[in-house]
Curated annotation (Swiss-Prot):
GO cellular component term of the entry, any: plasma membrane
UniProt family annotation: Belongs to the G-protein coupled receptor 1 family.
Alphabetized Pfam families for the sequence: 7tm_4
Keyword Phosphoprotein part of the UniProt annotation: no
Main location: membrane
Record protein name field: Olfactory receptor 6V1
Residues carrying a glycan: 3
Keywords linked to the UniProt accession: Cell membrane, Disulfide bond, G-protein coupled receptor, Glycoprotein, Membrane, Olfaction, Receptor, Sensory transduction, Transducer, Transmembrane, Transmembrane helix
Biological classification of the source: Eukaryota, Metazoa, Chordata, Craniata, Vertebrata
Role: Odorant receptor.
Sections of the chain in a coiled coil: none
Gene field: OR6V1
Amino acid sequence: MANLSQPSEFVLLGFSSFGELQALLYGPFLMLYLLAFMGNTIIIVMVIADTHLHTPMYFFLGNFSLLEILVTMTAVPRMLSDLLVPHKVITFTGCMVQFYFHFSLGSTSFLILTDMALDRFVAICHPLRYGTLMSRAMCVQLAGAAWAAPFLAMVPTVLSRAHLDYCHGDVINHFFCDNEPLLQLSCSDTRLLEFWDFLMALTFVLSSFLVTLISYGYIVTTVLRIPSASSCQKAFSTCGSHLTLVFIGYSSTIFLYVRPGKAHSVQVRKVVALVTSVLTPFLNPFILTFCNQTVKTVLQGQMQRLKGLCKAQ
């Protein structure tokens, strides 16, 4: 006999309040999604193909671009298809899987940002020991831990959601299976789960943010002591793109998920989720290109090479 407190499927309202105008959102969102996918793919290909980018900094950058693609894929394709159909239904299992991968990949991206901050800290504050401290093996270990820890930690989190009693309906007022809308449908006592969520946010978001801030505190102090203006400018330009990614990534997540006792309107959650799922992955390749001189130089070189091949044919 089926468990009536666990629906077989959920209805994702998405942008149903727009009515027939939903179809007009499809084109802009699809374009942003495709540009985000292509932009981050170009970054990954550049990191793999160009030997100038075979360094720890760009190894982590390639990981981050891959994460941007994967995080976007957990929610946006589903959102795009729902814009064109009247019945926006996701199975219970599909909802739990989407929840698991969305938050696991999102947490991993914050840890990779922290790895990037540690790399810049060692490069600028301890340049003579950089080759030893940031060896290939160490980079693989740091990246491996950043990927493994959230995926393991999210297992009990998603299992707890799967065993809740959902007797307040089956309609999720969002375009993906977000945490708070799911808990609002449950008639179980979720106080312990909410406390666990807060601990997870402290572990993967606030702690990594704190490590990043401390690292950049040391970096700024060290850079300001550099007598050469050109070296100082180079150091800041190298870190500028990373700092921009840190600000965009952490601000929206801390706003939504870290504050205890939080309560945000449905529309606010949807807008912030759109920023993190669509707009941020779209902007990141441009931030990395315009703020990072090395990436810009490599990209220009690849474009010149491609132009030369086209002329030769």
